[in-house]
């Protein structure tokens, strides 16, 4: 009898483990984008020097701003080409790597030439900054050139699937590569042309297989700035994504004021189906950084989006069957001015002003129980120091800038993070070297902690812990509770931009140079 009970208990434990051990195929939890995972049995600490709790380590480039995602036995992350894995890919490139989840072996990579007509369109050495979204055997990504690509999860090793077959030309540097012009000089977006000698890089088994490609510059009319930073949201047959439309190299001019900030593509073909119609682009202070989220509010599905103009929007998703050849306009449900007292006209004259400027939003809007949690404020490089964490009532409609605010909590200085909302608590880190825990219901501060370094990553809650890396290379693990408790502080010696990801009882931590798989 005791053996039978033990067997049943063991079976129950295995089932429970299987329930919480799962892939993490996109940035943030499900559609809500909350930085919270149901994973269990995760390590509290690790040590790369001694190997404690280290499952494997993979070498990356020298700049890694992309967060790892895990799906179907593979780990995906973007980096640069300063540590090339294939000698045919030389020089500055954006690189997107696919590793074996079991052992960290490189399975394939997408290596894309940088834009050359203007350094501010594809910043040198920045690499591939966007985070992938995976569904089945397809990987969706915005690459460093500002193109949305759909990739075969198995790479070219199983053949070149279509309809896109021109990988050789896409991996080869264009002939019209030129030095970056002086600020203010008129430049035009380059197109990819074969080199004059006709020699194309021949892709091999280690290269990516592009299934389709949508060029945001040529086909959506955007002007990219600094780097494409996006995380594609999948809803049914559609892809929702921010375009990275921004200022030019003067930081005082929008070259594409009529371009969309939020678009919808067909996930099977890459065809443009819909865009926003809110004139967002003309008032973008720096760039369109924030990816969209989605939730059901009172039985109604909504797309939430933070524009580069500092406005938080809710849109209705488009219908299942979009009209052929007609780009729809997304229907707005509400708008919320995140910083109503900020300048609204001639906004770029405030560029570089640390006391007064518009606000923008880098992190994603997080939906939990009819409320949106958004962090934003003055731009890290060009704006004022002020920043806030705000809670918005997502059940309202129209202009809810006044009546939609539930609470506002001041942060120390600038903010790049997406909030993590767990068990009635909100965790957020800012660039003023402070980590915050506040009440989700009213924004009441519970505790703060002085940390070493600015934070570009987001806090990540899993297994009763909060994981957080900083730009100084320090890595923290806090207890996810109302009373402050620091469980671990490590010095990883290399800056961290990426958010931690938990999947299948493993946490994945990316520094600028290495990807660690950590298992208890």
Question: Model regions: which residues?
Answer:
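Positively charged n-region of N-terminal signal peptides that target proteins for export
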Residues: 1-7, 520
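Bacterial N-terminal signal peptides
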Residues: 6-17
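Noncatalytic, solvent-exposed loop/strand surfaces
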Residues: 19-520
């Amino acid at each position: 009898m005791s053996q039978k009970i033990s067997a049943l208990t063991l079976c129950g434990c295995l089932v429970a483990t299987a329930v919480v051990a799962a892939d993490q195929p996109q940035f943030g939890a499900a559609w809500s984008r909350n930085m919270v995972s149901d994973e269990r049995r995760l390590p509290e600490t690790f040590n790369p020097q001694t190997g404690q709790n280290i499952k494997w380590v993979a070498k990356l480039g020298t700049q890694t701003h992309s967060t790892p995602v895990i799906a179907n036995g593979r780990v995906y992350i973007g980096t640069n080409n300063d540590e090339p894995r294939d000698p045919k890919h030389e020089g500055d490139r954006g690189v997107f790597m696919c590793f074996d989840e079991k052992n960290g072996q490189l399975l394939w990579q997408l290596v894309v030439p940088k834009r050359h007509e203007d350094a501010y369109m594809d910043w040198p050495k920045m690499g591939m900054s966007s985070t992938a979204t995976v569904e089945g055997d397809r990987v969706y990504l915005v690459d460093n050139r500002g193109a949305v690509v759909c990739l075969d999860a198995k790479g070219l090793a199983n053949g070149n699937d279509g309809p896109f077959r021109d990988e050789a030309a896409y991996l080869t540097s264009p002939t019209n590569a030129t030095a970056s012009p002086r600020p203010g000089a008129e430049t035009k977006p380059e197109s990819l042309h074969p080199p004059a000698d006709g020699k194309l890089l021949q892709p091999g088994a280690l290269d990516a297989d592009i299934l389709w490609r949508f060029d945001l510059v040529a086909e959506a009319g955007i002007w990219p700035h600094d780097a494409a930073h996006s995380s594609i949201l999948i809803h049914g047959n559609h892809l929702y994504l921010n375009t990275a439309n921004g200022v030019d190299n003067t930081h005082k001019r929008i070259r594409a004021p009529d371009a969309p900030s939020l678009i919808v593509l067909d996930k099977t073909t890459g065809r443009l189906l819909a865009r926003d119609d809110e004139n967002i682009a003309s008032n973008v202070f720096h760039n369109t950084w924030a990816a969209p989220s989605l939730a059901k509010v009172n039985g109604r599905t909504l797309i939430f989006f933070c524009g580069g103009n500092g406005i938080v929007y809710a849109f209705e998703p488009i219908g299942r069957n979009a009209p052929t050849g007609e780009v729809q306009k997304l229907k707005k449900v509400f708008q919320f001015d995140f910083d109503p007292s900020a300048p609204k006209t001639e906004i770029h004259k405030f560029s570089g002003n640390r006391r007064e400027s518009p606000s923008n939003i880098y992190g994603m809007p997080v939906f939990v129980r009819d409320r949106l949690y958004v962090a934003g404020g003055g731009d890290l490089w060009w704006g004022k120091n002020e920043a806030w964490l705000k809670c918005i009532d997502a059940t309202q409609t129209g202009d809810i800038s006044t009546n939609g605010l539930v609470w506002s909590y001041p942060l120390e200085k600038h903010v790049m993070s997406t909030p993590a909302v767990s068990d009635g608590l909100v965790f957020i880190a800012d660039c003023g070297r402070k980590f915050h825990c506040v009440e989700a219901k009213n924004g009441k501060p519970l505790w703060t902690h002085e940390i070493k370094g600015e934070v570009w990553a987001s806090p990540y809650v899993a297994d009763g812990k909060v994981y957080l890396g900083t730009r100084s290379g320090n890595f923290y693990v806090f207890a996810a509770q109302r009373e402050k408790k620091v469980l671990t502080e490590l010095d990883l010696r290399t800056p961290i931009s990426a958010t931690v990801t938990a999947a299948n009882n493993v946490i994945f931590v990316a520094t600028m140079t290495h990807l660690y798989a950590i298992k208890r």
